[in-house]
């Protein structure tokens, strides 16, 4: 009986474009989504002199563009430092997935924060919004690779660190427009 079930499942999997995984007790379902941590710098900030400025109109547009780029991804968590500009960058994507934005301490060593992210998440997409002086360190700690500094005038860089089933990291760098 079990071999007939397995043969049927093998045929269904081969005939279908979708992937399947066999879990404990023969439970069948889609394979787990690998973990991808998307790290971005906050969007454009207002040019006022406040210590904790909000996003500018262009920044709000970029935050909405980021949310649109992540719309079809299985976003499971969103993190930002405790500044308005980072929260406002993360909020549209988080809200689109029914998530609250979690706060992390930007002064925390990047390696420690990277370990926290890996311990807290094992699959899906995780969004992290940081600053020009913190994003390269976070990405480097996650991927174990060198990451160039971010110029203070540059916005829209996206760093996707994808972990395979064996925990190996692959970094993809792209740009999301406003």
Question: Where do the model's predicted regions map?
Answer:
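Positively charged n-region of N-terminal signal peptides that target proteins for export
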Residues: 1-4
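Conserved beta-strand position immediately N-terminal to the Walker
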Residues: 126
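Bacterial N-terminal signal peptides
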Residues: 7-16
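Short beta-strand segments
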Residues: 129-131
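Active-site-proximal alpha-helix that buttresses catalytic centers in soluble enzyme cores
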Residues: 22-123, 135-137, 143-178
């Amino acid at each position: 009986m079990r071999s007939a079930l397995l043969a049927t499942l093998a045929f269904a999997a081969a005939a279908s474009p979708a992937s399947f995984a066999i879990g404990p007790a023969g439970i069948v379902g889609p394979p787990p989504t690998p973990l991808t941590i998307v790290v971005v710098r906050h969007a454009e900030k207002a040019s006022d002199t406040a210590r904790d400025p909000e996003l500018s109109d262009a920044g709000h547009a970029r935050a909405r563009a980021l949310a649109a780029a992540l719309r079809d991804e299985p976003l499971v968590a969103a993190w930002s430092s405790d500044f308005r500009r980072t929260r406002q960058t993360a909020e549209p994507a988080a809200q689109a997935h029914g998530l609250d934005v979690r706060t992390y301490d930007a002064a925390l060593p990047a390696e420690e924060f990277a370990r926290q992210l890996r311990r807290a998440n094992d699959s899906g997409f995780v969004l992290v919004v940081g600053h020009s002086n913190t994003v390269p360190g976070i990405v480097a700690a996650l991927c174990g690779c060198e990451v160039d500094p971010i110029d203070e005038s540059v916005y829209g860089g996206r760093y996707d660190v994808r972990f395979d089933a064996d925990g190996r990291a692959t970094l993809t760098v792209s740009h999301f427009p406003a």
